[in-house]
Regions:
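N-terminal export signals
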Residues: 1-3, 7-25
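N-proximal helix/coil linker or "cap" segments that precede and/or mark the start of modular domains
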Residues: 22-49
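A short beta-strand-turn-helix
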Residues: 51-71
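Short active-site neighborhood of thiol/selenol oxidoreductases, capturing the structured segment around
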Residues: 64-84
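Conserved helix-turn-beta segment immediately C-terminal to the redox Cys motif
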Residues: 89-110
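Thiol-based oxidoreductase modules, predominantly thioredoxin-like and allied folds used
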Residues: 106-119, 136-145
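Short, internal strand/loop/helix patches
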Residues: 126-171
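Thiol-/selenol-based redox modules, centered on thioredoxin-like
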Residues: 163-207
């Protein structure tokens, strides 16, 4: 991996064993067993299987329904954000258009609210429509404690505790990865849309 594709903060342990999952699926080998064990440890540590609802009010479990065996993007936002969120969302719309029909088929885009008390499924649906988000991109809400657990588990935190408590100062990164291969990376949400799309394609090409 080149230096421009930095390993997901706090989740670097995912990367070293990624290649072992390319081993044959037809028989059990020590390498496959080790990879399966590593994947399970990562799931237990970083991917709490909390229950969420999307903009269509459909129920999802974070790991089983959103991450497992998929190539995904992850970011955090809130609908009434007037600063960084609209810019990142608009940029992700460009990314989705560049990826075309692979979104919803090979790649799944996921945005999680930082203000679940305000962002109901209906509010998320209106936000998605306003920004032109297409199929294959889900916007999630849920219990405040579950969203906070998710934010911290995924490393969307600021090392400055004071800033971390201010939702208006939230991290504007995008995480992307291939859960099955344990390949994870991150980039700024306002990075060039073509660069983001190509970076996401990188974790697919390694599948």
């Amino acid at each position: 991996m080149d230096t421009s594709r930095k390993t997901l903060l706090g989740m670097a342990a995912m990367t070293p064993l990624a290649g072992t999952l390319l081993a044959s699926k037809t028989r059990t080998t020590p390498a496959v067993d080790a990879s399966a064990a590593a994947r399970e440890r990562i799931r237990e540590r970083y991917f709490p299987d909390v229950i969420l609802r999307n903009q269509d009010n459909k129920k999802f479990r974070f790991y089983e329904d959103i991450l497992k065996d998929r190539v995904v993007t992850i970011n955090f936002f809130f609908a009434k954000c007037e600063e960084i969120c609209p810019l990142i969302t608009s940029n992700l719309v460009k990314v989705q258009r560049l990826l075309g029909d692979r979104v919803g088929r090979e790649i799944f885009m996921n945005s999680f609210t930082l203000k679940p008390e305000q962002d109901t499924p209906a509010a998320l649906k209106a936000f998605a429509k306003m920004h032109g988000a297409g199929p294959g991109w889900n916007f999630f809400t849920g219990k405040p404690s579950d969203l906070e657990l998710l934010r911290r588990s995924l490393g969307f935190t600021n090392p400055d505790a004071r800033l971390d408590q201010d939702v208006n100062q939230h991290i504007g990164n995008i995480r992307y990865g291939n859960e099955r291969l344990m390949l994870w990376a991150a980039c700024p949400g306002q990075a060039n849309a073509k660069y983001i799309a190509e970076s996401i394609g990188w974790v697919i090409r390694n599948d």
